[in-house]
């Protein structure tokens, strides 16, 4: 019996010895998408808050791994949910993709291979293996990459043609209405997303002979008919941005991740094209010139929540790399060109020859790139349209998508991402704070129907028949969405928003009151009333006094930009802005008409 026991122990130890010998040792495993990051993702601690960058799901990735014996053949097997998805053979280090402009190699020790996007998903497992070594077949431990959300970045392009700008004297609509496939492919490589869908907005374009500027920088609201009349360089773009935010709300997209960008084409006092020489962006929208180059990607960075990198660095190091540079960032990777993007400025870059005047210099005497969000345009190789973001900035972009509501067109339902379970879940939009932020998170109640978009401006200080600040822009007809609206002639609906009652939406008017109504008259003489969630009251005092500066023409308190979408099942004859203070009490038969326009 004792001999049998000794024999079993020897066999057991021999089995363990063989197994130990057959375990393949692998190190420094990385995934390259926008940036080359560890398989477990990358984290930063910023002011006591952890920021994390994950691998993006449903996006191809270059797999990199280092092995002790570089001369063997290595394979990576992808597993999912207990089943084998597929296997790829890794290229040896001599075949590692090059660096832009034939720069320094990323590594001399990494084997590599491209993993198809279909294999990159939450729950995937990777196991490496080798054949032909002195130990025979060797397999590694199973590794679990930190794969996160998969999502498509959807973007509307809505050109603004102002002051007589048209296809002939500026740029043709065929070029400004969207971005071509080449640009889209490069943007996907720069943005942390699974895919990009950029289309012309359903409105197609906005073509107005004049533009109403809100009070800004100590100047009153004004109507301008050429770009030279603006008081500062960003004034018109600021007004365009306000309209884009308004449209996102009108179309029920304010809680979504859908972005909107407007190429701005306008004429100066002599009827010539006037460049924007810059851009503005934020809160899912951006505007600038029509070229879709550095300004465009910078402003859409702001649209996704990114600040200027240098300013964030100076502000308690909320950006981790010196002066808004990429000094310390992981390298980038472009799968379209199958090459690495160093954090240093390459020889063919526009700014290469003069970069040492202003750039940070690395330990090898090279100029370090700046982030796209801090003067980085021009730091890229001449083959690229755009320069790089820092790896850290991908955390903000990823969070932008994690916090959004998604509409699933396949089943007509909504979903959100749960970052703990790493999965989408069915979601029903809710009304927050009793309607203070709108109803059902301002999601549409009808989609893809014929609509009119009505946009207006109103000044509380403009005298009747003097000036044109209080006006209604030309109607915009398109296919679009409708959100929940309230009719001030319907008592039941008004009771639901009455701040004095305990209705479902009793805080709907809490921001500034509900003092205005849009009235639409159709050619069949029927009427439609839409209560606006806008007023002239102090914040959270819907029944209280007016805002302090409501009579100051230089204050935003005296100006209102508003709009609604209505179904285009009838032809509109007239649109009016009515003064309907405390509209929840009902409106008079003959309310004061503040603005009127016939069509």
UniProtKB/Swiss-Prot annotation:
GO BP annotations, alphabetical order: proteolysis
Keyword field: Hydrolase, Metal-binding, Metalloprotease, Protease, Secreted, Signal, Zinc
The keyword Protease is annotated on this UniProt entry: yes
Cofactor note: Binds 1 zinc ion per subunit.
Location in the cell: Secreted
Group of enzyme by EC: hydrolase
Ranges of residues in domain Peptidase M66: 145-407
Molecular function per GO: metal ion binding; metalloendopeptidase activity
Claim: Secreted is one of the keywords in the record: yes
Active site: 299
EC id: 3.4.24.-
Requisite cofactors: Zn(2+)
InterPro entries in the cross-refs: Dictomallein (IPR051256), Peptidase_M66_dom (IPR019503)
Binding site for Zn(2+): 298, 302, 308
Domain of life per record: Eukaryota
Family matches, as PROSITE patterns: PEPTIDASE_M66 (PS51694)
Listed name of the protein: Dictomallein-2
Organism: Dictyostelium discoideum
């Amino acid at each position: 019996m004792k001999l049998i026991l000794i024999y079993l122990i020897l066999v057991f130890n021999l089995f363990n010895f063989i197994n130990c010998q057959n375990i393949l040792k692998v190190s420094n495993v990385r995934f390259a998408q926008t940036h080359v990051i560890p398989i477990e993702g990358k984290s930063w601690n910023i002011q006591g808050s952890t920021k994390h960058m994950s691998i993006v799901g449903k996006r191809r990735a270059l797999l990199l791994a280092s092995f002790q014996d570089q001369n063997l053949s290595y394979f990576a097997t992808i597993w999912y949910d207990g089943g084998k998805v597929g296997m790829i053979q890794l290229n040896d280090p001599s075949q590692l993709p090059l660096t832009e402009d034939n720069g320094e190699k990323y590594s001399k020790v990494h084997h590599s291979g491209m993993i198809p996007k279909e294999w990159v998903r939450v729950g995937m497992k990777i196991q490496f293996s080798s054949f032909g070594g002195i130990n025979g077949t060797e397999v590694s431990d199973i590794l679990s990459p930190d794969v996160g959300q998969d999502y498509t970045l959807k973007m509307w392009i809505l050109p603004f043609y102002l002051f007589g700008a048209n296809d002939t004297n500026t740029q043709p609509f065929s070029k400004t209405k969207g971005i071509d496939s080449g640009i889209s492919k490069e943007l996907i490589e720069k943005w942390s997303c699974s895919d990009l869908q950029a289309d012309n907005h359903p409105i197609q374009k906005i073509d107005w002979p004049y533009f109403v500027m809100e009070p800004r920088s100590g100047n009153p609201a004004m109507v301008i008919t050429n770009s030279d009349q603006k008081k500062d360089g960003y004034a018109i773009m600021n007004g365009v941005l306000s309209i884009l935010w308004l449209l996102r709300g009108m179309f029920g997209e304010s809680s979504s991740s859908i972005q909107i960008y407007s190429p701005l084409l306008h004429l100066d006092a002599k009827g010539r094209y006037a460049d924007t020489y810059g851009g503005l962006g934020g809160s899912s929208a951006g505007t600038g010139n029509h070229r879709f180059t550095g300004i465009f990607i910078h402003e859409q960075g702001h649209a996704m929540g990114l600040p200027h990198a240098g300013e964030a660095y100076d502000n308690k190091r909320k950006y981790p790399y010196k002066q808004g540079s990429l000094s310390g960032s992981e390298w980038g990777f472009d799968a379209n060109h199958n090459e690495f993007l160093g954090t240093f400025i390459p020889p063919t870059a526009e700014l290469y020859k003069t970069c040492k005047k202003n750039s940070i210099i690395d330990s090898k005497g090279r100029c370090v790139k700046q982030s796209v969000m801090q003067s980085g345009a021009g730091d890229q190789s001449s083959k690229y349209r755009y320069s790089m973001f820092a790896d850290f900035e991908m955390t903000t972009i990823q969070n932008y998508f994690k916090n959004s509501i998604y509409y699933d067109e396949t089943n007509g339902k909504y979903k959100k991402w749960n970052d703990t379970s790493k999965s989408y879940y069915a979601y029903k939009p809710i009304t927050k704070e009793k309607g203070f932020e709108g109803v059902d998170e301002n999601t549409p109640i009808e989609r893809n129907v014929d609509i009119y978009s009505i946009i207006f401006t109103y000044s509380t200080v403009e005298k009747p028949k003097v000036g044109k600040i209080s006006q209604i822009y030309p109607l915009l007809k398109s296919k679009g969405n409708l959100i929940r609206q309230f009719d001030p002639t319907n008592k039941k609906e008004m009771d639901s928003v009455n701040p004095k009652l305990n209705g479902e939406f009793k805080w709907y008017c809490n921001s500034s009151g509900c003092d205005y109504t849009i009235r639409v008259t159709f050619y069949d003489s029927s009427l439609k009333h839409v209560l606006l969630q806008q007023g002239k009251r102090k914040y959270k005092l819907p029944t209280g006094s007016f805002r302090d500066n409501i009579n100051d023409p230089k204050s935003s308190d005296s100006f209102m930009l508003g709009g609604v979408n209505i179904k285009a099942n009838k032809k509109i004859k007239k649109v009016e802005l009515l003064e309907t203070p405390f509209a929840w009490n009902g409106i008079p038969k003959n309310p004061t008409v503040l603005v009127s326009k016939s069509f």
